[in-house]
């Protein structure tokens, strides 16, 4: 169990580590050869060019201006200068609202921390319960635990202070959540009203198109929307299964990179000896061949395969999926279609807003809609087992990441680890580092599971993965660490007391686990966030590409991939800190300052990254905010329930029942916010759509909208390549055509002429009129 000294050692090491990271970053960002890495967003926007530094040849690589090194922390105030409105124009609403999550954490926990330290810390400190428990009940504790609720004796009237503070914390948190929800909802509506024209504003994704023996999918979609949306339908683009073609294109890109590498190597060496490669595993074994000739042949072979596969996709109706992107003449019409049921059979002609083209995850559009339910059921079961079986290794690793655990596994290290500094280092750092390393591959696993489920947009994939990551953190990182840690640390006490005393021991031990979370926050939230700004992985990849693949300035531009925020990993991390802060605020207030440092540091670091580095892959107009709000509410309810359970073990029978109202109030508040603000995030108001359409018609009366939308939702592998014969894949309707193409013999429900029959079938009214 970490002591105050251990916490101090851990804090010193993590602060020093963060400071070193900032110094290294300050040096690297000033060097001209790193400029594209640390200011990549400005290069992508065409607003920055390679810095011209004096000093001749050396000045191209090293910044020789010594005065610039004296302002190594100047980037911090610079990151805070850009106004929010300008930042939205620069980086998008998603990035700005993501930053507001950190700001929300500061607004919630700063007043809570001051109130908790002013009221609860004196109440907890001025007792001697833990001293008595240490002597008479053999319960392990340290001086730092005297600041927790565990130091208050059972049945004490002092628990009223914690109950009153729980109400105060809940009211303040709910108030800030409501204000923030209202602000973000207004920002979203204003952003949607002011943003420029985008293809997704006019387009819906139609899925589960029913099969028809007489018409192709394209003809059927065209006919259905000409009949049911005759005044508003504009064009459509059927979805095809181009996954194999995309794999071939990706393979060709990799082969071309190797060819560029060997050609560049041969040219730069000025040697008559041509580069050699081996055909075996990873080029380490097998027959030796001329590398340049080999990769030229492989690229040519793959190009032929791509051409053949492209023809198959274009001409084979089996590659056409029962889905289509349908575009309308107005945003109003698209909103009506996306938000209504199209037929009396609710399982067919399913419509939803189309994601913007860059947000589409194209491989999943080829998944049959009928298989999605089974896929999601399988992944839910897999996630259940992943979550709950992960508790065992996490508990085991954490049990070893202690002095007692190491001495048990490796007794020969006892002499070393019993030294004061080494002991403090282990107690203050090892458990947090072990947990962080244990979770390093989890985001990739969860993202793979989300992709298997078949979601069609990158934004929704990230939100789904973030949701699962949050649940995993809740069950394993929080509950698993608390329960397993308490059980291991109090094992001796568990074995030497009657069973009815065990809940009391757990109730006393849970607040003590705050010391572990303090060390974890410093490792993950202090040093980890500071390390984010270094961007070591993108930096290394850029320089490797620059050294071995870059031949032109365009190659140099493509060599840098700045990445994006990473909502699927960043948001669950933030939510873990919300959970820890709300749970431990009335129990162990000492944890709150560490959380405040995280929120403040992360806000500055990520604001800098959003301004200078990250290039967001999509823009969802803050559609993720209901998830953020819901998870903070979940954390608030968990904190209330745990406090009720904790007071129950403390025999605070007269005070504990007064907490029952808190979850009820919180759930009622959540339902109010859900009804009041959530519609702005799941539906597009028809009034807003009509206003935007009216303004656009007034400003651009001659806009060729069909030309703008015609190719917006073509699969990326058909754009910019050779032999792009995708004419059969694009709707060729003209605005004036009102004829409905069909191969059917009868069309009694079609109010427009058929190309086959030459005239429309008589309506029921006409038939009745003739009979009369």
From Swiss-Prot:
Function: Acts as a hyperosmolarity-gated non-selective cation channel that permeates Ca(2+) ions. Shows the following permeability sequence: K(+) > Ba(2+) = Ca(2+) > Na(+) = Mg(2+) = Cs(+). Mechanosensitive ion channel that converts mechanical stimuli into a flow of ions: activated in response to membrane stretch and poke.
Protein name, as recorded: Hyperosmolality-gated Ca2+ permeable channel 1.1
Protein species of origin: Arabidopsis thaliana
Activity regulation description: Activated by mechanical pressure.
InterPro entries named in the record: Csc1-like (IPR045122), CSC1/OSCA1-like_7TM (IPR003864), CSC1/OSCA1-like_cyt (IPR027815), Csc1/OSCA1-like_N (IPR032880)
Effect annotated for changing residue 339 to A: Slightly prevents the formation of homodimer
Consequence of gene loss (knockout): Impaired osmotic Ca(2+) signaling in guard cells and root cells, and attenuated water transpiration regulation and root growth in response to osmotic stress.
Transmembrane segments: 6-28, 101-122, 160-180, 373-398, 425-450, 462-485, 510-538, 567-587, 589-606, 625-647, 654-674
Region (Cytoplasmic region required for homodimerization): 339-344, 686-688
BP term (GO), one: cellular hyperosmotic response
Extracellular-side segments: 1-5, 123-159, 399-424, 486-509, 588, 648-653
Cytoplasmic side: 29-100, 181-372, 451-461, 539-566, 607-624, 675-772
Subcellular localization, as worded in the UniProt entry: Cell membrane
GO molecular function, one term: monoatomic cation channel activity
